[in-house]
Amino acid sequence: MSEPSKLNVEIYGHIYTLRVTPEEKAQVEAITAHVDQMMHKVGDDQTRLDYRDVAVLAAMNITEEYFKLQREYQELLSIADEEK
């Protein structure tokens, strides 16, 4: 694996400097874009929320997506097992 280098990313108006390898860069950028999008989805509708509250609500929405995908994956595994 290559040596990490610095990557500046912006999430909800804040700049973060991360250390990533060239192999990780595209995935980190995609993750950053998704987190930023989810924070804007929450924060743009609720102007009275502070940054921390927006981050927590976005994290809850992202986790909900993750749990839904886990359930769907398990259902697909069950269907595949039944067809064997």
PLM regions: where:
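C-terminal structural segments of small proteins and small subunits
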Residues: M60-K84
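N-terminal intrinsically disordered, cationic/polar leader segments
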Residues: M1-S2, K6-N8, E82-K84
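Amphipathic, hydrophobic secondary-structure cores in small proteins
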Residues: H14-N61
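Generic detector of leucine side chains in alpha-helical contexts
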Residues: L7, L18, L49, L57, ...
